[in-house]
């Protein structure tokens, strides 16, 4: 089977191409990582204070509850998954420690950090640890209290008729905590999520400042090193797992680890394939979708497709060049004020035109894209926002992150899967990841249902591209 993944890059600041280059314009790995050992794990306290003040100002009133994450057990209580802090908590407090919760009073202007100090038993196993008060000062917060006082603070506010603003929970323990604090059944929490808070957090987090841009560029530099390692290791006889292990190690060596589970597969027609047991074969293609997080948890995300034996066949090159042309065109279109859904459609049109030249599609390609026929080959959207999450703020909801009152989600195949459709603005960071996939099960389904009949040449598709 032939499978081509996305040629993916990032759009930063004024929606321009992300550059990670040394002074002479060439990548120099020794220089790129020279200062990595001196990096902090937080911005200065005033950064977080400024963000919280802006959140309060825009929201106007009420109590804003921002719970951090807790440790999550893997297979028994004492053996936990690597800790990952909630990204919104990180944005407003910067503290990458489990068991904290932040409260912002939008009326009084007061910030509070709730948590527990470490016990002597903790210190025996973990060594000396900073106090809750010391941690709070790093975030510009002076008032701290134990978690038992959080419940009392929330109860007092509710009794006074004040609104408690909170975001949609995505972890079970956070759902249960919010349920207990607010007196709302877990299955009913979604009805009480603060839409004003969701929209305000998105509006703040989606516009990256210079500090954040630098962190994302650093994440992209780590991601570059990961993908260069793939290119060095990719050859017949290598097991996918060897490459996956090597690049995951690079992500951890220079940052906080991978930004999502690495996809390293010569069966690239499966979009999110986390099986790494195949032996690479000459004539096949290796798809790698992988990225890294910095120590501050800012993310990168790149996809590349590599011929296992170092040389594309004519068929493979034809498809690859179509994807590359779509990628290049979307970079040209990216600018403040541009609609991201129009960039998606432009990429879709280039893919459709290219496939028509190969005989895989026929007829009027404008009409073909309008009905979503190219989604047989690119069943996903063009890309997504990126920042403290690789799919930035996806937990808050795509209807707030990718769409707004001006831009509503389409039901057309392909466009319906687009995570982001709204206008671009300076400071947004976007991925651009067009791709062509040959997915046998999807081809079977569409052909059986009579979809795109007269537009897609199913006979040619099966005879030359599903081998």
Predicted features and spans:
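Positively charged N-terminal leader segments that act as targeting/secretion signals
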Residues: 2, 23-32
